[in-house]
Each structure stands twice: as structure tokens, then as C-alpha cells.
Regions:
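Boundary regions of SH3-family modules and the immediately adjacent low-complexity/disordered segments
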Residues: 126-148
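Short beta-strand-centered interaction patches in the first periplasmic/extracellular domains
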Residues: 1-8, 199-210, 244-311
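Beta-loop motif signature
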Residues: 72-114
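Short beta-strand-centered aromatic/proline hotspots
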Residues: 104-113, 183-192, 412-422
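Short acidic/polar beta-strand-loop edge motifs in secreted extracellular
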Residues: 61-63, 69-71, 210-233, 243-268, ...
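Short, solvent-exposed secondary-structure boundary/capping segments
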Residues: 117-123, 190-206, 422-436
Length: 442
């Protein structure tokens, strides 16, 4: 609780590996931003610090980073280890996106380790079996000299630096009440120094690129599993939990995961089933957007009502607007199954109608039509979007719905695909909401 006579302001609490550093960073804090995404992207946290004296870059922060890098490198491999190269691409630099060839498999020696890099291991072939010479992914090496090999590579044995943050709006409505937003726990992703003037930007994300569930490629056949069961098993082995919030739980006789990370494979299964996935605060969350869109709007924003600071809207057509979707499948018995879904304002006479064609295994016409509806929604959902910047509001989070009125063709019901909460060093607080128009009627 705050004193009702206190000027409204926002505060943030920050912890590094469980140590409260709020008072340490307060004199340097420029801003703290928490981005909450609805699906297909990790939540992230960004902290900007002024560093005119170089205190953060050359002293305290450098020690923290060095400690983190040292810990993250203790993954069972070390410089000098001879490992089995599995035969994937190699790169000239640890940050390159374009491969420098794809040598065949063979033994190789680790010469440099840059844990956290896009391609963390530099290796050189040892006996001419392979001609690998360059940077490779963790998933492309396995086993040590004298040891066996496995189909998947191990990830980091130690955890990266964890950052936790909470935003508190103090006396925000002049009633003495405080409103807290727990941003969750994140792992250090990058540190950027820029200037002049000196600024340090610390970025942390909920599901780091270097995490095993995201980077380690696996091969496995899943027999007689439900989607929730696959998610639970993947979450458990990666130290996470699962929230399965969809009414329908697809079941698979057999589905193959081949040299694909757990999170990429799970995301593809969700998309194929018309479901959504997000990872946040150590949880894998699977839900049905159609169900969320059907919930009552939490608030209404009307043009000129002064509830917002600014707004923008966009209308996209290319690649985002299909009039119908057809799902078809020919079963082992030669029987053809087909289901078609249409947008709610479908005009059969229109010459501009585009139909999305999907070939997927289904067992009935009803199942085909249900999948067609979900695929149509997946491809059409970003046609109309609106963005509002409001005075700070901890209640405006991803997944909620709201109404926009008085905005012409952009009026209607929206679901929040992203909310960004930003606190300034002086105590200011804003919330930016990006919403996409809901797809009622199909």
C-alpha cells in the first residue's frame, strides 16, 4: 500500500540469480521493458542502464558475464576433447547464418568453445574421415574419445544467469493501492554496449536460444501419444511444466520427430492441430485461440476517449486473406476425405476469392472441416491489427480481448497478441498493446 498523497509512480524490482540488485541499478536505470507475447515467441525482458563512467561495462557487469560464460561452458565438453562429428553444416564464424559446406561425419577435436554463440563449437577433423574445419552447432557433435555416441547432443550442464523482475504501479489511481505485475524469470540472452553516451542494454528471454529444448536436435518415433503427453514428456526432461488449456487433445498412432528440436517439433504439431503454443516462466502453454477469442472483451477503447496516449492501425492483404480452405486426404483404403471452411462473409460470385489447399491425414469429413477452419484462421488472423499505447496498466496482458469503437473498418473485437510494459528510471509507466482482429464466424 502507498500513501494516497504520494504522486503516482512505478517501481521495478530486479533479481540476478536470486540476489536483489534493485538498489544497485537504481541510479543507472534508464528503462525496464517486459514484453508478453501471446504465441510463437518467447517473452523477453530488456534493461537499459546509463554507463557514462563505464562502471557497468568494465567492472560489475563484466564480472557477472564472465561468471555466466564460465558456468555455461561446463557442459561435459572442453577444448581438446575428440568428439564424433555427425555430418552437418560447418561455418566460418560462430555467428554466420550461411554454411560453408556440409562435410561428412567423422572424429574431430574441439579447439574453441563459445557457449551461447549461434554455433558454439569450433572443431577440426583428426584422421581425414571428415574434412570438417569450422564452427558447428551443439547438435552436430556427440560423444567423446573412448565414449559412445548418441542421436542427440547434450546441452549445457549448468544454467545461465537468471533474471527476475516485478513491476509495481504505486498509488496509480490515487487510492493508495499498488498494482504488481510479476514479469517472471528469464535467462540472460545478450548484453549490448553503445555510446556515446554510454548505455548498457541487457536482454533476457524466457526460452533462450541456447536452451536444450530449443537447440538440441532429437530423433524419435512417438507411438500412441496424445499431444498433451508429448508436451508433458518434453517439458519434464527439460525442467519445465505444462499447461494444456485446449478442449481437444489430438492423438497420434505414430508421429516422427527427425533431427528436430523438441520445441520446433511441438510447435509444428500445434500448428497442424490448429492450436497455439507459448513458453513463459518455465512453462509450456498450449491453448486454442478460437476459445480465447470467444471470451468477453475485458475493456473498450473508443476513438477520442483519452484512455490512450496514441494509436496506430494496419491492414494487410498479401498472404493473409483467404476466402476458404479445403483439407483433403486419401486414406490407405483409397477413400477420399474432404472438408471445406469459408470466411463468414464469403461471396461465391467474387472473382478474387483465394482458397487455401491443405493435405493432411484426417479420419472423417467432420474432422477435415474442423481442421480447415483452424488453418483458415491461422492464415487470416493478421489481416487487421491495431496498436495502442496506454498509461501503465498491469492488467493488459497477452491473450485478453478488447473492443475498439469509432475507428471505421478497424472497429471491432481484438485479441492482444503482444503487450509491452515499460518503466522509466524516473517512475513513468506505459503499456503498449498490439491486437489482431478476432475471426468471429469461423
Amino acid at each position: 500500500m502507498s500513501d494516497e498523497n504520494t504522486a503516482r509512480h512505478a517501481e521495478c524490482t530486479v533479481e540476478f540469480d536470486g540476489v536483489d540488485i534493485t538498489s544497485s541499478i537504481a541510479p543507472y536505470l534508464l528503462s525496464l521493458s517486459f514484453t508478453d507475447n501471446e504465441e510463437d515467441a518467447s517473452d523477453d525482458l530488456q534493461i537499459k542502464l546509463q554507463d557514462r563512467e563505464g562502471v557497468w561495462m568494465t567492472d560489475w557487469l563484466q564480472k557477472m558475464i564472465d561468471g555466466d560464460v564460465s558456468a555455461a561452458s561446463s557442459d561435459g565438453y572442453k577444448v581438446g576433447d575428440v568428439v564424433q562429428f555427425l555430418g552437418g553444416p560447418h561455418y566460418k564464424a560462430s555467428t554466420d547464418k550461411k554454411a560453408n559446406g556440409k562435410p561428412k561425419a567423422g572424429p574431430a577435436k574441439i579447439t574453441i568453445i563459445k557457449q551461447g554463440a549461434l554455433h558454439p563449437y569450433h572443431i577440426i577433423h583428426t584422421d581425414g574421415t571428415s574434412r570438417v574445419y569450422g564452427w558447428v552447432d551443439a547438435s552436430e557433435i556427440s560423444g567423446k574419445s573412448g565414449g559412445g555416441s548418441s542421436d542427440s547432443s547434450s546441452g549445457s550442464g549448468e544454467e545461465s544467469l537468471k533474471i527476475r523482475a516485478t513491476i509495481t504501479a504505486c498509488n496509480w489511481h490515487s487510492d493508495g493501492k499498488d498494482e504488481a505485475l510479476d514479469c517472471g524469470t528469464f535467462e540472460l540472452d545478450s548484453v549490448v554496449a553503445s555510446g556515446p553516451p554510454g548505455i548498457i542494454t541487457i536482454k533476457a528471454i524466457g526460452l533462450p536460444y541456447t536452451s536444450q529444448i530449443r537447440q538440441t536436435k532429437q530423433s524419435k518415433g512417438w507411438e500412441k501419444y496424445k499431444l498433451s503427453g508429448i508436451a508433458n514428456e518434453m517439458a519434464s526432461k527439460n525442467g519445465m511444466t505444462t499447461q494444456f488449456l485446449a478442449k481437444k487433445d489430438p492423438e497420434y498412432k505414430r508421429v516422427e520427430q527427425y533431427r528436430c528440436s523438441d520445441i520446433d517439433f511441438l510447435q509444428q504439431l500445434c500448428h497442424d492441430a490448429g492450436l497455439s503454443l507459448k513458453c513463459t516462466d518455465g512453462k509450456i502453454v498450449i491453448f486454442d485461440q478460437q476459445e480465447y477469442e470467444g471470451k468477453d472483451a475485458v475493456w473498450t477503447t473508443t476513438l477520442g476517449d483519452k484512455s490512450y496516449i496514441k494509436y496506430s492501425h494496419s491492414l494487410g492483404q498479401a498472404g493473409t486473406q483467404y476466402a476458404s480452405c479445403r483439407v483433403s486426404y486419401v486414406g490407405p483404403d483409397g477413400k477420399a476425405i474432404e472438408g471445406i471452411a469459408y470466411v463468414k462473409d464469403y461471396d461465391a460470385k467474387s472473382k478474387t476469392n483465394q482458397q487455401l489447399e491443405v493435405y493432411a491425414p484426417v479420419t472423417s469429413k467432420a474432422e477435415a472441416k474442423e481442421l480447415a477452419v483452424k488453418k483458415l484462421r491461422l492464415y487470416n488472423k493478421y489481416e487487421r491489427q491495431m496498436s495502442f499505447t496506454y498509461p501503465g496498466d498491469s492488467g493488459k496482458v497477452a491473450g485478453l480481448t478488447f473492443n475498439a469503437e469509432g475507428f471505421g473498418p478497424w472497429s471491432g473485437k481484438y485479441i492482444v497478441k503482444q503487450s509491452k510494459h515499460t518503466v522509466s528510471g524516473s517512475g513513468g509507466y506505459t503499456t503498449q498493446v498490439i491486437g489482431r482482429h478476432t475471426l468471429g464466424g469461423y
